[in-house]
Amino acid sequence: DSMIPRFNRVELVKGDVNKTIPEFVKEHPGMRISLLHIDLDIYEPTKTALDYLYPLVSPGGVVLLDEYGMADFQGESLAFDEYFGENKPKIIKFPFTPTPGGYFIKP
């Protein structure tokens, strides 16, 4: 933020994602997202994040799923697969890590 000190670009919100995300979106109409990093591990918070935040991702924006495809955190994958259904985007894996996860670019 030192490049543009008078504008706050980061806001940490403490609380239950299932409550704070809907409230945050309601309080910030017109918000757009260029990078959505989902690192929630389990189903319900991931579903909430997708329901409320994915529609705000700009075309060309990046969506990163930290635990997609991990056996220990199947909820994140399930929420993603259910959200997109037949229109599921192809997850691009990072070549520099042995763990699953990855990203896609919103059309």
Task: Label each region the model flagged.
Residues 1-107:
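S-adenosylmethionine/decaboxylated-SAM
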